[in-house]
Amino acid sequence: MEAILTKLDQDEKKALQTFYQCAWEETKSIIDDFLEVPEVRCAYKFNSHTKKMELLFTPESHTAWPEVPECKEFILNYLRLVSGHRVVLKGSSILFTKETKNLGIPSTINVDFQANIENMDDLQKGNLIGKMNIKES
């Protein structure tokens, strides 16, 4: 499956910008709340197989997460922008991997959507997440 890029006319461009602006405004407070990552939905562990410290983050435990399923890509983009993490896609899980300078070891945030994303085929090809740096492993 190939993504075909076409130039938007002015009306389409304006409508798309309006949609993104509305979606962003509606989800920003929820995203900011996610970034607090309280301990009840966040746990560090050492993965002996990959030899990496991992941070398991389960957004489903947050009551607002099911209310914005169509905006997960905004949340992912925002997390990537503010954290600077490289994004690796593995099935229904998204791994954010970043070198931890203080510790000298890589840290990993594993965000598991439990296959709630509808178009996984599109997601794997990067069609839904715009500028995210998605790499299949």
Curated annotation (Swiss-Prot):
Its main location: virion. The keyword rRNA-binding does not apply. It is found in: Virion; Host cytoplasm. One of its GO terms (cellular component) is host cell cytoplasm. Signal peptide: none annotated. Keywords: Host cytoplasm, Late protein, Virion. The keyword S-adenosyl-L-methionine does not apply. It comes from the Viruses. Induction: Expressed in the late phase of the viral replicative cycle. Plays a role in the inhibition of the host innate immune response. Mechanistically, promotes the autophagy-mediated lysosomal degradation of host TBK1 and affects IRF3 nuclear translocation to block type I IFN production. Interacts with host TBK1. Belongs to the asfivirus A137R family. This is Structural protein A137R. The lineage of its organism: Viruses, Varidnaviria, Bamfordvirae, Nucleocytoviricota, Pokkesviricetes.
